[in-house]
Amino acid sequence: MPAVAQTFPAFYLNQGRQRQGIVNGSFDIWQRGTLFTLTTGTNYTADRFNYYHAGGAGTKGAELAYVNPGEAPAERNISNAIVLTRIGVSGEIDNDEFGQKIPGVDYGAGQAVSIGMYLWSDADEVIGSLVAEQRFGTGGTPSPTTRTTYATNIQVTTTPTFYEFTAILPSIAGKTLGTNGDDHLAVFLEFNLNDDILLYTTGWQVNVGTAVLPFQRKSRGEELADCLLFFERQNVAGNFLPSPAMAWDSSHVLANLTFTPKWRPPNKVALSIVPRFQYWKDGYARSFSAESWGYADATETTIQGQFEVSYDPGTRGLTYVWQASSGSPVWIDVSSEL
């Protein structure tokens, strides 16, 4: 009878990040959405996981997938996966990567670190390599990245299979960290150049030691709390915002919006918004012609933002109710991703 993994409270996880360096390894948290078209550069998908698109032609995507009952991941109480799609790929001059950044380049340094995950595909395929990179951060004069290759030419079949790898990471004695506090250990799969593939993966496990420890899921609430340390999205699309205090010149309204994240940003903060607002007058929605967004107090627990919208001077002095324009969701993202 196969062993069935259980959901453990965090204090049973023996102990902290040495026991499991990966956050959201069973792909349960998807704050940014569940379907992604990947573009050149870094693309965050399921929380904490990112796909680095190095360029070239073709269609690349990522999407939430589900584990079928009876498949191997389900025996460990894993129900979700991610599927990475590469179609018609050509012209790549560098390798695409998919994985996660573990905060602190000291993780497992000078020790054996083991990595495990489920992999399967729609046909027999070959993954280029599994890599760990010790990245010493930015700012100042940090030491150059060191690279450890765990495996090359990883054979993947249509059956979900758990793969296990172990390597000894270099010591970081004598190395120099950057001054921005963003040093980390990056663990990622690296795709072969110009390789079309449809790859499923879940159950990521990274731990210090010479063997991959059994995958143990945290509760969804605990996993979300860990994800919120790095990224938080608040959707204001469906919310009516109270009429704000206004200041204007001949053609602009300024309105304050206060957003309180659930955590104190540890490294940096970047707010992004798609601020297509509309106002209501005489029972009808009226759109503003232009908007912009800025923010202040970014290092404080409460982040105060201000958006500016142009308006018809004839409406000045009315009471406004703010709402997202139809079909245009408004997000506020607070990120301290490495």
Question: What residues fall within each predicted segment?
Answer:
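Extracellular and organelle-lumenal recognition/adhesion modules and their flexible linkers in secreted
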Residues: 4-338
